Amino acid sequence: MCIRDRLTDQPLRLHGVPDITDVRKILDIFRTLGSEVQLDEATRTLQLHHRDTRFDASSHRLPEEMRSSIMLVPPLLARFGVARLEDNVKGCTLGVREIDPHVDIFRSFGGEVERASGSLLIHSAAPLKAVRHWLDYASVTATENFVLCAVAAQGESMLTNAACEPHVQEFCRFMVMMGADIDGIGTSRLTVRGGAPLGGGDFTFEEDFHEITTFLALGAITGGDVEVRNSTPDNFPLIDRTFAKFGVQVEHKNGWSRALRSGPLKVQTPFTSNVLTKVEAAPWPYFPVDLLPIFIALGVHAQGNALFWNKIYDGALGWTGELSKFGAHVFSSDPHRVVTFGGNPLTPAVVESPYIIRVAIALFMVASSIEGRSEIRNATPIRRAHPHFVENLRSLGARV
């Protein structure tokens, strides 16, 4: 969200800003570009003003280690007519992360894209033009990049097969607060009437449903009673039903959520014969793919068998082999599907996490449910999404 405000030169105040590493990296980029940045860590309030920014494509390259840096291209293109992006923009190691959908969007709005010394130079001599575009896949970042370009372009643009995740909806509401004209928020078709200057203002972020779910799952796998405040129950109907597949009931009341189990975790048997209980992850409103690892952790600990299907990424399940070090029985059907055979006795182990945020958390979840000392190596990605993960765990009584 911090990136989106570069389309305005008016002051902005953002509330509820998470203290995560990606935010700090983005703010460092802003400072390099000459923006005024004030972050109050105690109140999680961020003040930004981009009135005196500067950009030189020959010296300013957007960082390749953050996938979100690709969303700096539209604001830079709109304000300076040029941006330079590494052609191997990374993120979590989930498999091939395509940039072609973004290139298609930049080109459709009138941008020219060319390779230059290991990077992509995106430039536009003329103002961006309104377009109609159809995504071949409902990508979150591609959807947001389209909206950023469309807001800057003169005229009415339309996107079909838009992503509609809660954070995409919040992003659109943020743009509307700044003065953007967007219809279809929360649907697969967005209409943006652009060209008007954007203003400043105040905006408060809602709590991340991924983090809420993570702590509910931690309570469920350990048998603890964890209450998460400032919850967002409107995002949870399908997540709640998925918890129920493992014998966990989720209660939402008065702004908080709690996961409850009356006995050991147990995979619920489907009414359909000859099929496994399954969790299918795909673009929203399907089950969120980012949450699949923590439910695989529940599946390992639960009695019974379950199928987990990642319909998006081709390299996001390779880590499940690490679970065997705990004594878990997990079968990889193909790059997109694994089956957990739960109920095996589990023992402490030393495991290694790939660079995937919630895989590190999933491995921790399994370890936390086993008596004894385990070690999760390469767990630093957790800080990219959970600013006070260890501190919160200790407040719940965990020895970390």
Predicted features and spans:
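Short, structured segments at the rim of ligand-binding sites
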Residues: 1-400
